[in-house]
């Protein structure tokens, strides 16, 4: 195992132990990726402009891509419909919930018209939503468990406050707003929880690289994806193995996952870290599969020895 002092000097002291693949993608870039790879989404793009693209090496691989501008179109699935315009105008409709707004740092400041289970309309609803995925510990792994929704919003009522009913509402306005808030929270949490859980359940445990040769990536989440500072973050365990060679599947005898540095997301729209553990498993698998030959010369040996 690598000396800890040297490892901390090379990798930095702020590391996460047990990680193999770690990535951060801002929300706009994530949508662009989904747009290209999801067959249900219209693939018309209004405008794409990419600047300042580079790849640098830092404890594995760090990919930097910044300044992305794009226009998008529509996504629809059964009862859920989300419409995007090139101006970043958004319209969401889920059963009785409709929302309009503009995409800013996240889906902030949405004007909502809610009619389900409530006899009157709500307008001028300013909403700020924070979505967090809770996790549960199973053995030495963290698995997705539930979604917590934090909402902060206010609104006005659309009726005549001079009427008898209007005067009654003034007296009990806070109580009515509390009931409405609870109903909206239940609806949003139910929809988001279902959608995110379905998405996480579709993540494969194995990613096939070459079926004929038996190459696969053994993959599992260390922590479930979560949103922080307008980035979708994920941390996962991964190793490259050959299903036809049992020796490559015995992870405990050769390499140990150690850690990956913390993110440096200033000026970036995405970042990916690959640990030395993943790289070592890939090299070992290629070597055992006779795809890779290792040649040590006398000069290299002397340099390493010195």
Label each region the model flagged.
Residues 1-102, 152-306:
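Extended, low-charge, aliphatic-rich alpha-helical segments
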Residues 83, 127-137:
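Extended lipid/amphipathic-ligand handling interfaces
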Residues 107-109:
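Short, surface-exposed beta-strand-loop junctions and turns on beta-sheet-rich folds
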Residues 111-128:
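Amphipathic hydrophobic-ligand
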Residues 125, 130, 302-306:
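Eukaryote-specific, cytoplasm-facing alpha-helical/coiled-coil scaffolding segments in long proteins
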Residues 134-156, 233-236:
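Short, well-ordered strand-loop elements centered on a beta-strand within folded domains, enriched
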């Amino acid at each position: 195992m690598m000396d800890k002092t040297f490892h901390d000097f090379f990798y930095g002291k702020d590391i996460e132990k047990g990680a193999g693949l770690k990535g951060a993608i801002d929300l706009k870039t994530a949508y662009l990726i989904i747009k290209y790879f999801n067959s249900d989404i219209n693939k018309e793009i209004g405008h794409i402009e990419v600047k300042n693209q580079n790849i640098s090496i830092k404890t594995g691989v760090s990919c930097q891509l910044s300044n992305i501008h794009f226009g998008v179109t529509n996504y629809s699935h059964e009862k859920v419909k989300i419409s995007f315009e090139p101006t970043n105008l958004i319209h969401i409709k889920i059963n009785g919930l409709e929302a309009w707004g503009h995409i800013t740092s996240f889906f902030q400041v949405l004007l909502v018209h809610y009619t389900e289970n409530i006899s009157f309309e709500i307008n001028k609803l300013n909403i700020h939503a924070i979505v967090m995925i809770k996790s549960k510990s199973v053995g030495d792994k963290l698995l997705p468990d539930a979604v917590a929704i934090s909402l902060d919003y206010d609104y006005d009522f659309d009726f005549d406050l001079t009427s008898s009913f209007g005067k009654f509402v003034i007296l009990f306005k806070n109580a009515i707003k509390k009931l409405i808030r609870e109903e909206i929270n239940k609806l949003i949490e139910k929809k988001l929880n279902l959608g995110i859980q379905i998405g996480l359940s579709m993540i494969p445990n194995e990613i096939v690289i070459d079926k004929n040769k038996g190459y696969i990536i053994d993959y599992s989440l260390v922590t479930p994806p979560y949103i922080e500072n307008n980035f979708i973050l994920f941390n996962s365990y991964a190793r490259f193995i050959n299903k036809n060679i049992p020796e490559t599947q015995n992870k405990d005898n050769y390499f140990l996952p150690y850690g990956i540095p913390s993110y440096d997301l200033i000026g970036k729209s995405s970042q990916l870290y690959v640990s030395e553990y993943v790289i070592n498993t890939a090299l070992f698998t290629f070597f055992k599969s006779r795809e890779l030959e290792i040649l040590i010369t006398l000069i290299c040996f002397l340099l390493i020895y010195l």
